[in-house]
């Protein structure tokens, strides 16, 4: 069943500078959409604690149901070998916070992906995910090397730049409600620049 918020979009693709690998974020959560008949009452979003009811004839009364009708991972990060035409590896990107609170990790986030990727020649992939973290992976095998908590949701692809001989990773984090009352992380918001510690 297709969804209207993916598979791959929002700057969710990056290429390794030299080895022919492309990394793609995919969102795998289905959406049920229909039109209302004239005079028909718009239903609340069943399954969502917010019970949001909006005006209009466009209705997504199946979106927001949890757990979804598919198994995790809900969001994936996939490495494609363009020379061989094969998948090198695929992992769940981030965590669904409702499941992570129960000790279930690696599911990929079930929230809409609005982040992006950067791949470096030194073998790293930086990915912003809907779980409000920056994830750092080994580009060779998809092993997670680090995760950096943010104080808000990311929107748009991260950037990388150099200033005075030092390399920086720039991401955005915007305060927004958490889906379905999931736990809030504490972390920075706004434009956030990361860099490795300077050597003495």
Task: Give the location of each predicted region.
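A fold-level detector for beta-propeller and closely related beta-sheet-rich head/sensor domains
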Residues: 1-200
